[in-house]
Amino acid sequence: DHLEFFGSMEGSAQAKAELLDHLPQDGTVVLNADDEYFDYLASRAQCRVVAFGASPKAAVRAANVRTDDKGGTLFGLVLPGKTRQTEIRIRTQGQHNVSNALAAAAVGHALGLSGAAIAEGLAKFRPAAMRSQISQSHGVQVINDCYNANPASMKAAIQLLAQLGRD
C-alpha cells in the first residue's frame, strides 16, 4: 500500500478516506470488506458503498471456490438482490486473484451489469506475465511471481503454493 509515501497502513487508510471525502453523495465506492480498515473507510463514505470479499459484510462474494485442471479457478458469484449465483471462471489461481475478480465484479454490479456480463468479462481476463504463473518441469511446480514483487504478492504466492499442495 505504498508505505514509503504514507508511513504506515493507518496513513494509507487515512489517505484513502480523504479521497472518499470528495465523492458526491449520489456516487458509489467499491471497498474490500476483508480489509482491516473497511469499517473506517465505509463510515467515511457519504455515498453508496458496494463491499466485496469473503467477509459477511460483503455484498459481492464468491461461493464454492475451486480450481480446475487448466490452471483456472471456478466460483459462484453472489450478487446482492439475486437469488441465483453466476458461475465464474478466471484463468488464474489463488485467493488473491478471486478477491481481484470480486473487486471487478463489484464495479460491474455497481454499474448495473448483469451477472452474465460480469462472467463474460472476467472470462476474457488474461493474467500479466510473471504474476502467479504456474509451470511444471520434471515434477517440480514453479510459481513465477517476480513482476514488481512485494511482501503482499510474495505472501499470496506462498499461499497459492500451499493451496496447490492440497489440490
Feature-to-residue mapping (PLM):
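Active-site beta-alpha connecting loops in nucleotide-dependent enzymes
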Residues: 128-130, 146-167
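Acidic, Mg2+-coordinating active-site environments of NTP-dependent enzymes
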Residues: 1-141, 166
